Amino acid sequence: MCDILIFGGTTEGRQLAEFCAGHGINACISVATEYGAELLPQSEYVHINIGREDASGIAGMIEKLGVSAVIDATHPYAKEVTKNITAACTEKNVTLYRIKRADDAICESAIY
């Protein structure tokens, strides 16, 4: 059983996993790829799930893990997964926290 479910794939997701590992917080970290999993800390407190889930799959994870909170630390442009996470948390009545980057994290020289 995990205390929290973190959807990662960003630096912030990895940092949250490291924090949980260092503070004895049981966390399930869900990443889309094997590469994302390789970047996470190896710890008895960090449980890694690899793969992409739709809203129904995420709701099932929430129920199976029995978490009371979910953290969405996915990439800012990963709109679909954020939509699925939000729908699943609403369905399961679980608190959702979304990690957002500061506006100054946007590269001034980038062309969007």
Give the role of each language-model region.
Residues 1-4:
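Extreme N-terminal starter segment of soluble prokaryotic enzymes
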Residues 12:
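Hydrophobic/small residue at the entry helix of a nucleotide-binding pocket
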Residues 16-27:
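A short, Lys/Arg-enriched amphipathic alpha-helix followed by its capping loop at the start of a domain
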Residues 31-37, 99-104:
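Short, polar loop motifs at secondary-structure junctions
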Residues 32-36, 41, 46-49, 67, ...:
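N-terminal positively charged helical leader segments and presequences
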Residues 44-62:
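Glycine-rich, highly charged phosphate/nucleotide-binding loops
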Residues 59-112:
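Glycine/small-residue-rich loop that forms an oxyanion/phosphate-binding "nest" at active or ligand-binding sites
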